Amino acid sequence: MIFTAFILDYWYFTLLFLIAAYFIGKHVYTNYLMRKHHAEPILDVVDDGAFGFKFGFQSLKAKKIGNQIDLLFLKFNEAKHPSIGTFVTRSFGMQFIATKDPENIKAMLATQFNEYTLGQRLNFLAPLLGKGIFTLDGNGWKHSRAMLRPQFSRDQIGHVKMLEPHFQLLKKHIIKNKGTFFDIQELFFRFTVDSATEFLFGESVSSLKDESIGYDQEEIDFAGRKDFAEAFNKSQVYLSTRTLLQLLYWLVNSADFKRCNKIVHKFSDYYIKKALTATPEELEKHSSYIFLYELAKQTRDPIVLRDQSLNILLAGRDTTAGLLSFAVFELGRNPEVWSKLRQEIGHKFGLDSYSRVEDISFELLKLCEYLKAVLNETLRLYPSVPRNARFAAKNTTLPHGGGPDGMSPILVRKGQTVMYSVYALQRDEKYYGKDANEFRPERWFEPEVRKLGWAFLPFNGGPRICLGQQFALTEASYVLARLIQSFETLELSPEAAYPPAKLSHLTMCLFDGTPVRFE
């Protein structure tokens, strides 16, 4: 009775005692875990300001002006020991570890793969993408990967001839703008959604066909086709913000977000219904390869088909469009690189009126070494997924970041977020020299690049390495080769800012587009 009265009369002392006990207990338990896992305290702690809300709002502000990716890049340089490449900070109250250390990334993606998960990613992305290969963990992910892997064999990704009709439409748009500066990034996104929907569904949305190049708008036979690309884009903006807000993701669930998701789902459901109405015998007899029809041989569940198709569509459209946009941006400001590419492509496939389009194949494109170097250098400076995250499935460690020299293991508590920046890693002078921020394809012919290992990760690594990497590289190689065959010069607008602002949703592209001129 007296004890209860004391607590009620001096509740503030009780509260202070409980708070102190909590932090002391947490400190003692953390030290115990560090001893158990042979870990050291993390060397760098970056000031987050007001429980990370300062950094969180900085990120939201930077996102609006195309500087969000560079903000994290600068945080690495502002750390007390920038060469360590690992620090701890907060965002919107959540503590997380940020790293660009190749060994730490290798641990999460490969050697300690089972100790790290995607965490809340399914909750962030499910309204649009559902349960697909990019949102699932564990057995669900294993099943998805086993189901999708056969769809990306060389026979499927090597059919470059299907790209030519789409390139001809792209070329008409370029010719229409010939001699003037225009944004080709917007056209690349239309090109890749056209080619991706043909690969996935057997029928292109033909977004490049419009009145500006002499086409009447195609009559649509179901609602949502015209609005699909716009809705898909807007949904990704919402998903990106949900991801940025982490535990507060549920705040982003507006009526417009739901409307966009409904349009995208209705679009994909149209094709899924067509695939499911076909008998297994009809699916086998289909003359050309269609991703959805092959998938329908393995499952007749319409939700599974929709979710996996949209996951692949996201990767197939956005990564390739971003890669092409950044490549053309750099080629436009580096005419000597464009000239070298013309020499290689001319030697292999001819140029201008002497172009041998029929000779371009998956196998021969892989032999174009300078073209490969240009794409590698583009992916190095502008990785499609510039940053990513993993969450500790249990109390575990990362190899580097602790101790007086930053080379000792650090503790990662169960549920803790680890964000890794491929963008920062691939611009690190430690691995790429003093000119790490410069576009120089020739570096890929130097012996040092053979030693890069996990310092070059444009398509992730480990068991979750991107299934579609050859698909993206083949498509980008084909489009660049055909542009080089078709146009003699490429110039970037003198008004284009450098370095360019970057728009990062789930993947990265140019914030202000790619203003170029072809002749």
UniProtKB/Swiss-Prot annotation:
Pfam family, one: p450
A molecular function GO annotation: iron ion binding
Cofactor(s) it depends on: heme
Gene Ontology CC: membrane
Location(s), subcellular: Membrane
UniProt-listed Gene3D superfamilies: Cytochrome P450 (1.10.630.10)
PROSITE patterns associated with the record: CYTOCHROME_P450
Upregulating conditions: By N-alkanes.
Binding site for heme: C466
UniProt similarity note: Belongs to the cytochrome P450 family.
Record protein name field: Cytochrome P450 52A10
Gene symbol of the encoding locus: CYP52A10
Role noted for this protein: Together with an NADPH cytochrome P450 the enzyme system catalyzes the terminal hydroxylation as the first step in the assimilation of alkanes and fatty acids.
Chief place of localization: membrane
Keywords: Heme, Iron, Membrane, Metal-binding, Monooxygenase, Oxidoreductase
Enzyme Commission identifier(s): 1.14.14.-
